[in-house]
């Protein structure tokens, strides 16, 4: 599914990734653990195509296709997803409208708002989110736990082939960890891959 070969990447002329090799097959969950500053989030961003980082050497192969030079939106259309460590707030854009736009771009299907609400209702219930959660502006005024639940909600609705979770477990209390963990477990299937980034040694 995903194969990273001798990946070197830098930002502002400073090399951060120095020859990373990784292979993820369908149905597998891989964890990248390490202290802050060790390059875990850099790897997640480089795999997803963040233009801030420059790949100086190596290749990223997804489902047999070399995507090393592909932009972020193309990777999303191929079925890749990144749950951010620090999700941004977007005032004026509701969660349901963001999901509607994302699905339209990825699947080339024009969902109505009603169709989208039906699609997200079950996932919201599983994550312990209230019915009006989808009408809130994206991450505006959200607690840390709500931001992480929103990332998992996006994961559930967008249903990618490969999900990269960048420290989705950080900053959560015990209940938040349980809800997010259960949400990810329910989404895991034999045809999907997961790359989990964490600084927790567990």
Describe the predicted segments one by one.
Residues 59-75, 139:
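ABC ATPase NBD Q-loop/coupling interface
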Residues 177-190:
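Helical segment within the ABC ATPase nucleotide-binding domain
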Residues 155-156:
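ABC ATPase C-loop
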Residues 33-35:
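The feature captures the beta-strand-to-loop junction immediately N-terminal to the Walker
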Residues 167-168:
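Walker B catalytic motif
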Residues 86, 92-106, 119:
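Q-loop/switch helix immediately C-terminal to the Walker
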Residues 197-199:
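H-loop/switch region of ABC-family ATPase nucleotide-binding domains
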């Amino acid at each position: 599914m995903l194969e990273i070969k001798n990946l070197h990447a830098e930002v502002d002329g400073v090399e951060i990734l120095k020859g990373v090799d990784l292979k993820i097959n369908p149905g597998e969950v891989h964890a990248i653990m390490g202290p802050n500053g060790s390059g875990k989030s850099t790897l997640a961003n480089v795999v997803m195509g963040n233009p801030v980082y420059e790949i100086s050497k190596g290749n990223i192969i997804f489902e047999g296709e070399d995507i090393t030079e592909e932009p972020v939106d193309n990777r999303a259309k191929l079925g890749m997803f990144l749950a951010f460590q620090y999700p941004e707030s977007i005032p004026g854009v509701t969660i349901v409208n963001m999901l509607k736009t994302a699905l339209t771009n990825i699947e080339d299907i024009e969902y109505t708002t009603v169709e989208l609400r039906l699609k997200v209702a079950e996932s919201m219930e599983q994550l312990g989110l209230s019915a009006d959660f989808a009408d809130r502006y994206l991450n505006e005024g959200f607690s840390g736990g709500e931001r992480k639940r929103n990332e998992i909600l996006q994961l559930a609705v967008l249903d990618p082939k490969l999900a990269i979770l960048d420290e989705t477990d950080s900053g959560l209390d015990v209940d938040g960890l349980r809800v997010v963990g259960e949400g990810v477990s329910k989404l895991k299937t034999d045809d999907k891959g997961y790359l989990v980034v964490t600084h927790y040694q567990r």
